[in-house]
């Protein structure tokens, strides 16, 4: 069972791309930074003025990583399986994990940033990560709604049974 890109539908492609965006934003983009007069002072002292998600969200990072892995597993399973059973199950996991991650990130990015609110602010990575988690949840839902057998995996001809007699036998 090799991976066939033709088995992927739009929701799985979107989930895979959003998972990669979330993963990259976790490590490469600043999620939180100092605001106000502290940022220039910290920069002059050689202190980093921003942190990525991996270093600033000690518990949430595991949920985010699990969401990324589930979305990538959905892409892999959809591309390698002829039957929709496993991809359908993973669509549910991706939908639920993406939704839970989005809710947690809404809280951590928009409502309660780590650290004092008058000192720490959310940066671009936090908003990109939040958007990516919302997209993953939506793609998981759309993938679940579109479940079925791909046209190339469908049976070519459905066998039918022909009866020559139209009479019904009566018991004697």
Q: Where in the sequence are the language-model features?
A:
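Compact integral membrane and secretory-pathway proteins
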Residues: 1-172
């Amino acid at each position: 069972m090799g991976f066939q890109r033709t088995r992927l539908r739009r929701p799985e492609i979107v989930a895979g791309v959003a998972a990669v965006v979330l993963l990259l934003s976790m490590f490469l983009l600043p999620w939180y930074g100092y605001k106000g007069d502290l940022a220039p002072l910290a920069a002059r002292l050689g202190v980093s003025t921003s942190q990525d998600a991996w270093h600033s969200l000690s518990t949430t990072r595991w949920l985010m990583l699990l969401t990324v892995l589930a979305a990538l597993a959905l892409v892999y399973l959809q591309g390698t399986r002829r039957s929709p059973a496993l991809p359908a199950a993973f669509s549910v996991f991706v939908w639920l994990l993406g939704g839970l991650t989005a809710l947690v990130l809404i809280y951590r990015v928009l409502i309660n940033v780590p650290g004092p609110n008058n000192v720490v602010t959310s940066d671009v990575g936090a908003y990109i990560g939040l958007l990516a988690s919302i997209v993953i949840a939506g793609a998981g839902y759309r993938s679940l709604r579109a479940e079925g057998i791909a046209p190339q995996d469908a049976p070519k001809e459905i066998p039918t049974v022909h009866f020559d007699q139209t009479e019904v036998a009566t018991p004697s």
